């Protein structure tokens, strides 16, 4: 099967982000973390907003421009390249990360579609909606910043577009009690995607292979 998103190797990631990305990211994050170390040492949990990850990524890439805050699907722009930044976390024994939003719809029909188990309408609204936004970007990339809850160290994974012609098939959709699991966007060994009824949005989780395999995981921050 041809997936929409495929994982990038470390050479590809370094080529996208630049040779000095890791060093600059470490420096930028230290500036954010330094005032918080007192509280972290006392056991307070570290909480960083979505935009802070975007700011640091933007500041760590030469000639990059931040364009997040819900203005478009991308958060960081480098010329015609658009980067969608997802900040997530995991525990030591996790098999997947926390979730991040990919696409949200506030249409009232969403709950009706779930009640009727109407997989095609849910797909058309969320998956096709997300694909439409991806197609609007000349060169789209999705990056995940995975923070370890125990150590606060971070690694980065990235995905590039391989195919935007993914079509609805009933067997790509599977209902659980509160969500519809969507297959086909990426290999399930790397990414899990679901549409949640209560949140009315398509969400992504990164799977353990993406941070365990050194071919795909780039260490970017050491606490």
Task: List where the protein language model places each region.
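Nucleic-acid endonuclease domains
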Residues: 2-73, 77-81, 87-223
